[in-house]
């Protein structure tokens, strides 16, 4: 056996040993470019869970893990909101084309997985759902619909009911931070994480019609102040 052959074998042995050097990152530890992240747990956990909750609920923003919401909102609606955000609210744009960090494919993957994991078509089978979006209705008719469907929890004027842990839904700062579509979504889908029923109401209640939903939203939107925060306290 020649010395050259022995040296070659030794070099190959050293190279093979490099594959298991101490400190070498495992496959799961290797850096992945942000635009190549595909796992739902990573995409949702890094971009959505801070507002919408680790499991799509119990976060400061509305739950996405909500069968009624996912039944009303189409894939196109979810992709548009995720991509472009909601101007004037705390929902940012995530699409790279809109200044965010996610590719169109990553956003489509997020929406597909959210629906696969959290949608429950059987929960709304046979239910006539109001459309996701619609023009504002009539505020005066909305006052009557609000009185019959909402006032028992939120108060006759929307400022809440003494002894009930529900804040004002006519607070100027709140209305300044929520869009008309945000109000509509809440009226339709409720807030299951906060104990608020959807448009069907509680047991024995009469569901709101599509027209009544639009009217209630108009009633609330009409209370949005032009300049949130006023009147300002007098300076001494």
Please identify what each model-predicted range represents:
Residues 1-9:
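Bacterial N-terminal signal peptides that target proteins for export
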Residues 19, 49-52, 154:
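Sequence contexts marking disulfide-bonded cysteines in secreted/extracellular proteins
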Residues 15-17:
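C-terminal motif of bacterial Sec signal peptides marking the signal peptidase cleavage site
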Residues 30-31, 37, 41, 53, ...:
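Gly/Gly-Pro-rich "capping" loops immediately C-terminal to redox-active cysteine motifs
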Residues 45-48, 61, 88, 147, ...:
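Disulfide-stabilized extracellular ectodomain repeats and their linkers
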């Amino acid at each position: 056996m020649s010395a050259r052959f022995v040296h070659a074998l030794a070099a190959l042995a050293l190279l093979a040993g490099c594959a298991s050097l101490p400190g070498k990152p495992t496959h799961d530890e290797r850096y992945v470019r942000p635009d190549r992240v595909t796992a739902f747990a990573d995409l949702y956990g890094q971009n959505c869970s801070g507002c919408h909750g680790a499991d799509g609920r119990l976060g400061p923003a509305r739950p996405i893990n909500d069968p009624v919401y996912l039944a009303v909102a189409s894939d196109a609606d979810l992709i548009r909101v995720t991509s472009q955000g909601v101007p004037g609210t705390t929902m940012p744009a995530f699409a790279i084309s809109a200044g965010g960090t996610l590719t169109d494919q990553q956003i489509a993957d997020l929406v597909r997985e959210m629906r696969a994991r959290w949608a429950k078509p059987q929960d709304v089978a046979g239910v006539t759902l109001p459309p996701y979006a619609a023009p504002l209705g009539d505020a005066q008719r909305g006052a009557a619909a609000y009185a019959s469907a909402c006032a028992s929890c939120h108060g006759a004027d929307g400022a809440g009911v003494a002894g009930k842990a529900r804040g004002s839904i006519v607070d100027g700062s709140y209305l300044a931070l929520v869009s008309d579509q945000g109000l509509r979504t809440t009226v339709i889908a409720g807030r299951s994480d906060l104990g608020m029923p959807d448009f069907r109401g509680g047991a024995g209640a009469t569901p709101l019609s599509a027209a009544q939903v639009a009217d209630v939203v108009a009633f609330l939107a009409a209370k949005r102040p032009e300049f949130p925060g006023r009147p300002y306290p007098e300076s001494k």
